[in-house]
Amino acid sequence: MPSHSKNKKRKSKSKGGSTVKKSGGLLEKGIGNITAELYNDTDDYPTSRVIKRAPNGDVIVESLPTKPKKSKSRQTNSSSNNDMILDLDSHWEWLSPEEKKNILRIDKDEVFEMLSRYNNHNSNNVNGNTNNNNIIGTGSNNLSGGISTNSNNNTSSSCNCNVCGRRHMAMDQEMERIYNRLYEMQRENYEDMTHIKFHLNIIKDLQKRKTQMISPPASPEMDSNNVDEAREPNSGSSNESLDIKNDLETMRDEVVKYFLSPNSVDTLKKEVLNFKHNKQKQFQTPISLNEDNTEEVVEDNEAQHIYDDLSNEIHDSGLIESPRTVEDDANIIDIESKSRYLNFAKTFISSHPTIAQEYVNKMIMYPEMKELTDDLMNNNGSGFIKAIEEFVLDKQKQNTLPDTEIDINDVNSQQHENPEEALQVQDLGDAKEFTTMLHNGQPLTSDEYANLQRHIAERVTDAYNTETKEFEGISQLEKELFTRFMHGSDRRQFGDSILQLFKNKYDDKLSANSISTSLAAAASTITHDIISPRNDDGNDTEEDIDYYDDEDDVSSENIHHRNDLDDDFKSREEYSDYNSDFHDNRKCEKYNDFDDDDDYLDNNRNLECAHAEHNHETLSTYHHDVDLADSNSHGYKNYASHHTSSQVSEDYIDDIDDDGYESGIDENERLEEGRKLLQITITKILQRRIMESYHAKQAENNRMKLLEELEAEESKKKEKEEKKQRKREKEKEKKRLLQVAKEEERKKKEEEAERLKKEAEEREMERRETQRKKVEAAKKKKDEEKKRKLEEQRKREEEQERQRKIKEEQKRKKDEERKQKELEKKKKDEEKRIQEEEKRKKEEEAEQKTLNEKKRLDVEIMEQKRLEEEEKRLKSTASTSNVPYAELLKMTPSLQPVSGNINDELFGMINAATSSQSIPTSSSHLNHLLQQNDASHFNMTPRHDLLNPSGGMHFGPSDLIEQSHFTHKSNSFDTLAAINDPTTPQTTLPYGNSSVPPNSFDISSWGNFNGSSTAETQLQSQLPQQSLLGSHSVTSDQNRKSFNEELNTITNLLSTTGLEDQLSQKDSFAHSSLWGSQGTSLSGSNPNLSSNFAPAGLPINQTPISPGNIGIPTTTHRSSIWDISSGVDYSLNDNKITGSIQSERPLSNVIPSSYMSPNIWSGGTSKIPVIEQPLVFNPNENQTNPISNIILRELSLLTLPNSTDQYVSSELLCQKVMANRIDYGVYFTELMNLRNAHKIEIASNDNGQVTHVKLVYKSKDELEMPLNSSENQNSHIQMQQNYGLQPISSTTAGNTASTTANNANGSTINTSNSHFFNINKTISNPSVTANIWS
């Protein structure tokens, strides 16, 4: 015994228990959980006890059995049924529809196999039953003898076996005939009847018959008295015999009540006894006993049959095996097998010899233990382990469903009328999906869903009527929800809640079984109300019948007989210590007493009919087996099946009790008996399948627990590895031989298949060859026909091609002729066009020559007129001047007009020639450039009005600025361009308060600015010529020549005319040449500039000022308007201050930046001053600004000698500087630059206008030093602060100094609103920087 057994016993004593302990065994707790459990903790530890050891080594403490203990154990049976009920119901509910269908599909062969197997089994066990009869105690000998005599008497009169009676036909043949007859009868009613449907209909008939049976008039009390009276004369008994009889009666009642519901036990007895009475009265079977004793014995036998039916059912069905002794099976298991089993038990169960022997004895008594042991010995337990694994997997998926039962009568009738009801229950859908739909598509939370279920459960509970067993006052929606919850995935929880509510409400009125039954019946009514409208289709398929029959069985069996299966399963588990872990020890212990009683009852089975030559007990035993199978399987159909099977069994026995085949039983009764027997057989098959399925599930759990024990015993297995290895080798050898046999069989089959395949291939090849020949013949014929058609097609195409070529040839010839005519016509048209073109050219040339000649004459006439007008102007000037005209001509000989100037004549001719040329017709645009070059030159004619020796050259400072004003020309290219434009109106700007005409510098004194305007006369004399130059815009296109022709004409003209003519006067400025510089050139001298002005009667300098000696640059030819590459030379009279502007010098350094030209052709300046960049030289250049030098020079001349603080009037200085052809804007900008450079000082009045300027004397080096832009800015800002001057760009008064240059009437500076000077003086010529070439 293991060392820990004492600890187990000590624990048992500490608990103080006195009842039997049984360990969970290998399959429940494992090796490590060895404890002694007490059923009743309040009792003391049993003093009369038996200490045993379980096969797995656990200690078992059992008290000695006593009668009170047995009675108490039997009383506890009903309380332990509820646990099994839940397990069985859960197992059936969790079976898949396919598994349920498989259980309900019963074939004909299976029915007859079941009949044959149980018939043979009962025949083979006749000897065993006889031996059991001999073991009965002495107290039962009298009873057994009496019954034996009765049996002998029955034998002499008639035989009840399946061979001797009737037509001496075997039972199997008779049942097959009856089966076929019943099947044909069913087929006459149903065309689509099959064997499966036939079997299910038989079960339905059984259920219907149960509901229609009439209760017998006899009472159970009278029957019991009759049984007692029949037994009392035969027993001659002692007290022990009476005790045995009482025990037998008590045992019989308890067993019947155990397997049937309490309400149906008395009804079943009445029906059986009534049936027996009717049969006996009908056949009048003679018996040797007196009438009273016979009736008593029959009643006693009938009661005995009821119990024997149930007990034999337990043993023979394999669900609860009856214990057998070792002597009964001595012939089955020999000594050698016993020794092997004993060694196995010692190795794997327990090393204790007593325990091992006990295991072998139980194994011999129970075939399932023997099968398990053989599997462990032969296959190393692989089958058992696999079964355990499957069981565990199924157990994990298994859930217990609510304890709801459906009344068999209602559900059977409903499903009989609506065969598809079970399937449509599944079609209701998931309850959660339905609630989601009711909740507008939003799923309920878990709490809301639980609350809804609880509400429906309470509503159903309150609406249940215990009298009518129906739900009243429930809405259709509540019924729908109830049905979906009952069939949903969480139906177990919902069912538990429903059941609990019913128990709480009706626990005082109803028992638990009645609650479940009532609830199921009412639930089936609700479900039927929901589903029944959907049973539209009356055509039931085989699967549908299987399914709803399955549900029918489930419903009917759940109503009445779940308690029976609970006991069956527990009874069976008690016999195997190996499988005893599924239920606790209390459930198994209660069957110990029952097994003892079974041993006693088995000894009394000889009370049934027995024959000397035949085994008459076979039939009755068979019926008993079938009847009890009804009661033992999963609990389905137990009541109806047992009830009906008991009747069939009794009926069949009584029928056999008739004397002979020629009895009064007709064919209909035979068929009815066969139907009942088939009902019993089919019911037994269904019950066996359900129980097998259930035990398979349970075995899976047992397997997993056994695996745990096997792992715990791994150390023991290592010690005996050699023995196992030999066994495994033997098993492998057997498997190898079996595999070899299978392989040979497989090879034979493959060879046969190969041979058949080759034969088939040969036949196929022959067929294909025949087919190929047929196809080739057909193809050959088809090809010939195709060739013939192709040949015909080719001939047709050749003919069509020939006709097409003929048509094409004709068409080609026509096209050639048409093209030839078109070419000739085009040639003639071309010749005609050429002739017309030549004629037109000749006409144009003649017209052009005429036009040129006319233009030349017009130019000569205009030039002549101009010269005449010039002479007149000069004469008028000379007459108005104080100086005589002759002296004036003598002083300025260069101003005399040169009438024979060839250049002037050529200039007019070229202008006349180019004016007729169209700009767009010139490919090189030279004509356009020539026009611009002409426009960029202005003819500087002699200005006689500026040289007036007698007019007085002294200027007065009084009214110089007030009487003079400046006017500005419009923004045109220059004077010539403005005159050439015929559309420009010759308007004259107002001259203000001055009476002096514009362009006049004939000043006789400082107080008078009067003088004749020679410049105006000069411009007027030039108008005809300039107008002629612009006449090309109206020349017609047809009179134009190409540019090349015109150029050639001009070249020829120039070549024939001498260009060597010299000017008659040396000092005169010649006209600018056409091919000369594009920049501004002076064509004449200005007498007004020939002398320097001096204050207070200083003599005028007689040296004339030319463009070279006043510092105005003489530009050279430029290729574009942006070209400033040519250097500019400045010369300033006798001072010889010269400088050159480099090619990289920007144009803005020459043109004042304060007033920029608004366009590139305008010689004037903009009205918008640009003060941000005053006119200063680049500090990096070693240059001096010539305009600044002019201002300084004029200022120094106006300043008295040796006077350092003398201020000069700014108006006088402005007049002197502007006499050098400098714009006022340039003058003022340079004046500000000089002030910023601290070379001059400026004085202003209260209005901020510059009134006086003073020269600041510095050294010569500082005078020549270039101005710095930063210093200029700083000094400018400082000067503004010192003198309170406003910035030049200031617009405080809303006025801005502006200039307008190159007006047609002269150059005028308009500063009427200026902050600096309020002057309106005209100047004779525009600024030298008034065009883009300067």
From Swiss-Prot:
Presence of the UniProt keyword Cell wall biogenesis/degradation in the record: no
Domain of life of the organism encoding this protein: Eukaryota
Xref: Pfam families: NST1
Annotated Polar residues bias: 981-996
Ranges of compositional bias, category Acidic residues: 538-555
Organism: Vanderwaltozyma polyspora (strain ATCC 22028 / DSM 70294 / BCRC 21397 / CBS 2163 / NBRC 10782 / NRRL Y-8283 / UCD 57-17)
First-listed, main subcellular location of the protein, grouped into a coarse class: cytoplasm
UniProt-recorded name of the protein: Stress response protein NST1
Keywords: Coiled coil, Cytoplasm, Stress response
Localization annotation: Cytoplasm
Family, similarity comment: Belongs to the NST1 family.
GO biological process: microtubule cytoskeleton organization; negative regulation of translation; response to salt stress
Role, per record: May act as a negative regulator of salt tolerance.
Gene name of the record: NST1
InterPro entries: MAP7_domain-containing, NST1
GO cellular component assignments: microtubule cytoskeleton; P-body
Comp. bias intervals (Low complexity): 15-25
Keyword Manganese included in the entry's annotation: no
Region Disordered, residue ranges: 1-82, 212-242, 530-565, 712-849, 977-996
Coiled coil: 694-876
PANTHER family: MICROTUBULE-ASSOCIATED PROTEIN, RETICULOCYTE-BINDING PROTEIN HOMOLOG 2A
Disulphide bonds in the chain: none
